[in-house]
A protein has these predicted regions:
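Short, structured coil segments at secondary-structure junctions
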Residues: 11, 29, 118-120
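Rossmann-like adenosine-cofactor binding region
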Residues: 20-115
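C-terminal helix-to-coil terminal segments
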Residues: 106-161
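Conserved anion/nucleotide-ligand pocket segment
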Residues: 1-14
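Conserved beta-strand segments of alpha/beta enzyme cores
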Residues: 14, 32, 98-99, 121-123
Length: 161
């Protein structure tokens, strides 16, 4: 996953993580779980790698942005509604947030009235971070393995037995 890759390439940086469900395998000398307040206040880069739940919707909002370091960079390739786009656009335009790299927005395809389209230092890609050759190959390999198991009479990942 993207988070695994980030942790393995950390090149001496200190990695802080926040999650209501901690994965203790990730907690190492280079990765430490902290409360959200500490993550917001200490991070130079905040990369969102989380699902969209009621407790994560709008987690990047005016209130939480005010707790961030000046000049922080925001990355999101998870779910668009994790970010209150108007609040992020205002923070980008004011310089509070230095830059944002987004692969997702709250409504896709992006609408022309999305405030992030005119915000300073905001790069938006069309929900394609999953599309590198390696990711597509992995999807094909999983599909082939699932089909083989099904044909052998030992299907995996059964949802409705």
């Amino acid at each position: 996953t993207m988070s695994d890759r980030m942790f393995s390439m950390n090149k001496g940086m200190k990695v802080l993580a926040y999650d209501t469900y901690k994965n203790l395998e990730l907690e190492t000398a280079t990765c430490r779980y902290v409360e959200l307040e500490e993550l917001l206040g200490e991070s130079d880069v905040i990369a969102l790698h989380c699902p969209l739940f009621s407790e994560t919707e709008g987690i990047i909002n005016k209130n939480n942005i005010s707790k961030m370091k000046d000049g922080v960079i925001i990355l999101n390739n998870s779910r668009g509604p994790l970010i209150v786009e108007k609040d992020l656009a205002e923070a980008l335009d004011s310089g509070k947030i230095a830059a944002a790299g987004l692969d997702v927005v709250s409504i896709e395809p992006i609408r022309q009235d999305n405030p992030l389209l005119t915000a300073k230092n905001c790069i938006i890609t069309p929900h394609i971070s999953w599309a590198p050759k390696e990711s597509r190959q992995r999807l094909m390999d999983i599909a082939v393995e699932n089909l083989k198991k099904f044909l052998q009479g030992t299907p995996i990942n059964i949802v409705n037995p």
